[in-house]
Amino acid sequence: MQFIDRSEIEVEGGRGGDGMVAYRREKYVPAGGPAGGDGGHGGAVVLEATANLQTLLDFKYRHRFEADDGTKGGPKNLTGAKGKDLVIAVPCGTVVQDAVTGETIGDLTEPGQRLVVAVGGRGGHGNTHFASNQNRAPDYATEGRLGQQRKLLLELKLLAEVGIIGLPNAGKSTLISVLSAARPRIADYPFTTLVPNLGVVRKVTGDGVVFADIPGLIEGAHQGVGLGHEFLRHIERTRVLVQLIALDSADPLADYRTVIDELGRYGRELLHKSRIVALNKADVCLPEEAEHWRRILSTETGEPVLVISAAARSNLDALLARVWQVLEAPQGVTT
């Protein structure tokens, strides 16, 4: 299941340093020739993939990036210092495109992989460069060139293994936000309301598992009502579905059947996907009422049904344990 997070940025390589006009002044060289050094080249802008980032959220607050300029050439034919490259960390899975031409520049998939996206300008020539038999003491040098400027579109494709589905009132986003708040090593990134909320959960082994809530699943979704078609397609690519049902609903059983009906109408194969059913919002109803609906839903599904409260952080460990159990089972085997 892939979601795309996009950010547009501007990058500019550093300007090259100017060349210098200078002459030899040693007393043993009475007719000193030119000795102006070249300017240093400007630094480049480089993207580097890292496993420590999961989203492009950093680029929401900063859009322009410039590498350092090269320094001016010096006397005695000294070349100016090269500008320092600007290395920008991006998540693995970032596809880089030229925002103007649409050309794909690169795809950063492995940690440590680098891509130069804007080269620095060349340093200018000092007057030594222009000496000739006709002009033994040129009194001019050239300026450094500007660095490359580009507008880039960054697209991040994340693979979500766990899809959280349910009607709009089921508490899907709350569940992800609570899981993230409870575990500092989980990165939570809120997309707009038109795309899923993602939360990266790290197991005790250190492996990251991407959870995504799937908005837009309402009655008529299979016909494209709301955002139905788009998100039902996303659901096809998950390994396991967590179906949340709100206990404060007038009829939790009807809510369950509505979602199942939409899944089946879109594609019968979705009904065979590993699915965990959880009654949410146990904090807003009596325990006996929650147990009543748990029994009904267990009979309906033929599977154990969990009772949780995302808001109260109740029984979430049991939910995650069940998710890990399903994910660790061989693919194609329902646990």
From Swiss-Prot:
> Which keywords are on file for this protein?
Cytoplasm, GTP-binding, Hydrolase, Magnesium, Metal-binding, Nucleotide-binding
Lineage: superkingdom:
Bacteria
The places in or outside the cell where this protein is found are: Cytoplasm
This enzyme's EC code(s): 3.6.5.-
Q: Name one GO cellular component term.
A: cytoplasm
Span of domain OBG-type G: 160-328
**Binding, GTP:** 166-173, 191-195, 213-216, 280-283, 309-311
| Tagged with keyword GTP-binding | yes
Could you confirm whether the keyword Cell wall biogenesis/degradation appears in this record?
no
Q: Which Pfam families match?
A: GTP1_OBG (PF01018), MMR_HSR1 (PF01926)
Name the enzyme group at the top EC level.
Answer: hydrolase
GO molecular-function term, one example from the UniProt record: GTP binding
Residues forming the Obg domain are 1-159
Q: According to its UniProt record, where is this protein mainly located?
A: cytoplasm
| InterPro entries in alphabetical order | G_OBG (IPR031167), GTP-bd (IPR006073), GTP-bd_Obg/CgtA (IPR014100), GTP1-OBG_CS (IPR006074), GTP1_OBG_dom (IPR006169), GTP1_OBG_dom_sf (IPR036726), OBG_GTPase (IPR045086), P-loop_NTPase (IPR027417)
Name any cofactors this protein relies on. Mg(2+)
One GO BP on record is: ribosome biogenesis
| Amino-acid positions noted as binding Mg(2+) in the UniProt annotation, renumbered to this chain | S173, T193
Stored PROSITE patterns? G_OBG, GTP1_OBG, OBG
Q: What does this protein do?
A: An essential GTPase which binds GTP, GDP and possibly (p)ppGpp with moderate affinity, with high nucleotide exchange rates and a fairly low GTP hydrolysis rate. Plays a role in control of the cell cycle, stress response, ribosome biogenesis and in those bacteria that undergo differentiation, in morphogenesis control.
Give the PANTHER family listed for this entry: DEVELOPMENTALLY REGULATED GTP-BINDING PROTEIN-RELATED, MITOCHONDRIAL RIBOSOME-ASSOCIATED GTPASE 2
Subunit info here reads: Monomer.
Task: State the family named in the UniProt similarity comment for this chain.
Answer: Belongs to the TRAFAC class OBG-HflX-like GTPase superfamily. OBG GTPase family.
The name under which this protein is listed is GTPase Obg
Encoding gene per record:
obg
